[in-house]
Amino acid sequence: MAMISFSFPSPAKLPIKSQPSVSNRINVADRLILRHLNAGDLRGAVSALDLMARDGIRPMDSVTFSSLLKSCIRARDFRLGKLVHARLIEFDIEPDSVLYNSLISLYSKSGDSAKAEDVFETMRRFGKRDVVSWSAMMACYGNNGRELDAIKVFVEFLELGLVPNDYCYTAVIRACSNSDFVGVGRVTLGFLMKTGHFESDVCVGCSLIDMFVKGENSFENAYKVFDKMSELNVVTWTLMITRCMQMGFPREAIRFFLDMVLSGFESDKFTLSSVFSACAELENLSLGKQLHSWAIRSGLVDDVECSLVDMYAKCSADGSVDDCRKVFDRMEDHSVMSWTALITGYMKNCNLATEAINLFSEMITQGHVEPNHFTFSSAFKACGNLSDPRVGKQVLGQAFKRGLASNSSVANSVISMFVKSDRMEDAQRAFESLSEKNLVSYNTFLDGTCRNLNFEQAFKLLSEITERELGVSAFTFASLLSGVANVGSIRKGEQIHSQVVKLGLSCNQPVCNALISMYSKCGSIDTASRVFNFMENRNVISWTSMITGFAKHGFAIRVLETFNQMIEEGVKPNEVTYVAILSACSHVGLVSEGWRHFNSMYEDHKIKPKMEHYACMVDLLCRAGLLTDAFEFINTMPFQADVLVWRTFLGACRVHSNTELGKLAARKILELDPNEPAAYIQLSNIYACAGKWEESTEMRRKMKERNLVKEGGCSWIEVGDKIHKFYVGDTAHPNAHQIYDELDRLITEIKRCGYVPDTDLVLHKLEEENDEAEKERLLYQHSEKIAVAFGLISTSKSRPVRVFKNLRVCGDCHNAMKYISTVSGREIVLRDLNRFHHFKDGKCSCNDYW
């Protein structure tokens, strides 16, 4: 057998075993970094870079650093990005333009525009700038509130003879979204039209849409851009839907969504979230449910659950939030956003403030998700609707524990909570403890001072706002004007109006709307009408404010004329508009007209009537004496009538002396709210009118057992710079003797003219022998009569006497005012709980129908 021999090489010829070369080690390290990045392990990639630095290994080029920086930017981990930049300097690698541009983007998105400037200047020294660099620098300035610098960079770019591309145009147009620079944006649009970039790029079109919406507040121009875009995608459609919502056009947002679907585009989670917001705004539960089903079929429901919770909460017309709770309970993982959406949904329903706080406590107790500043803001708003101050203090303790109490939005919510709870001393302490007060802080506290009629402090706050150049907002003046309107201080209102003119806000739409409301509520409807007529740009709030003003003054014909003019000008009414329309019809007895408008709400404008609209219809029928029709109407409502509806009906039962229906209405009220004093008071009055004194006394006794107190009648009048308040039989005023002398004189004179006191309105059983005389004395001491007497001796004869009352004016006072206007030769303007009465020459503007 032949032997097979093997020949081995000599040791000298064997390959030498060697260490890997430095370049091989660098390639391995680079590949390791890239492998970490491809796996989404950013921290692992940066750790590999640190190992290279420790071992003294220098990467071969800038590609690795560029990849690292882009990953840091995508992950928004700017701390790691800055660490990568430090390593870049340490390794002494010369960046190329791509790497420099990534550095500008890093510092731009981290908000450090000064550092981005340094990088951009370095690029100039080394001749590394390109069009992308210029675009990135413009975007940096534009995104960090330095719009003018962005425009300057664009001008410098053009002066160098460089040709802008789509990214460059997009960056400068976004900078022009500030209203101060829209003119520059329009000039840039001219460049776009000439160079053909207008229709070439989706991003350019989107930036133009934003410029017109944010800078000009012009959705019409934004739509023109959208309509001319050659390429549309889900981003452009979603942008238009979102901007519709931001401008307060939810119906248009839904129309855009339907057009998008019909055009064959698939919606994404951002689209659906915006459309759910539109459904929530319109309270269109039917469409919201259809879209919910669509989201389930599309597999997007998990991405829009927070929007669903919000939508179901806002669409609960009957106060039920069961649907939004069901969506929340079905969620596998609850985020801080979903918890906050649910808490906010409960908070916005004032009757469920306790449940909102319980949810907040549940979130804290579970401990899986930490509340953020939005959660605390909603929790504090819920606390503001509760009467127990201890709850608010407990929530505040949780905010301090998490270091969120100093957050501006949380701190402002705390101030708002104290204001709503009428705890102004606590509100002031919270306000003064703020290290940095912003305009919202001032507005919130100022609103509280106005509510509490502390106008001296309110005007001081206004001075501070202007001195600190915080920029007085429309809300600032709205709060001031709302405060003076509530008390009827027309002098203070006129002072604020002069401030508005001085600050150049006389054409500001929200401010003008507040002025219309203020003058209307202060009894100067003609001045309100002048403000309205001088407005160049009126929205639905402007029209509704004017319509409401006419309605409160009893000018039903002017209400209907203004409403028709509003429709002719293409302005769509809202729910508040119809409350004013129905109220106007109610106060002048236009039953058929009221029915017509009630039915047209949904038929013509797709507005579903709410509880307040049904209450207006009940009031309309009751004032016309149609109690049976009103009762049947209540029983056919699509949801259970609330206390407001039954209270309206009960008041009518007292006026029309219908004891049986009155008892039924009172029982309904007490079933809904056992502590509602109006039910006991009205039923007691019904029994008294019927001569059933024992039953009347029994109602008063039950009130006393429950510690329920009837709101006392109070009237007030502004004389000089002071508000003078009067109560029934009030003798506390320094001029009480002169007031009662004038009142005695007036009573004597008006009796000579035919005035007869209506003693049937004194619903007390008196034991005195001279029963009628005592009843007359009680009538003479009503607060509105005292206030009018004071007004006649304290104000100029050339001005109307303006009196305000917190309750409905009684029939006897109403009759007496007509006579007083005759004997005094003065116009008397009286605002009660429901409306204005203009007494002049023995007649009232309400024609005795109120």
Swiss-Prot record:
Keywords: Chloroplast, Plastid, Repeat, Transit peptide. PPR repeats lie at residues 61-95, 96-130, 131-164, 165-199, 201-232, 233-267, 268-302, 303-334, 335-370, 372-406, 407-437, 438-472, 473-507, 508-538, 539-573, 574-609, 610-640. The keyword Repeat applies. Residues 1-50 form a transit peptide. One of its GO terms (molecular function) is mRNA binding. It is found in: Plastid, Chloroplast. The keyword Chloroplast applies. Its main location: plastid. Residues 752-850 are annotated as: Type DYW motif. GO terms for cellular component: chloroplast. Pfam families: DYW_deaminase, E_motif, Eplus_motif, PPR, PPR_2. Residues 645-720 are annotated as: Type E motif. Residues 721-751 are annotated as: Type E(+) motif. GO terms for biological process: embryo development ending in seed dormancy; RNA modification. Belongs to the PPR family. PCMP-H subfamily. NCBIfam families: PPR. May play a role in embryogenesis. This is Pentatricopeptide repeat-containing protein At3g49170, chloroplastic. It comes from Arabidopsis thaliana. The gene is EMB2261.
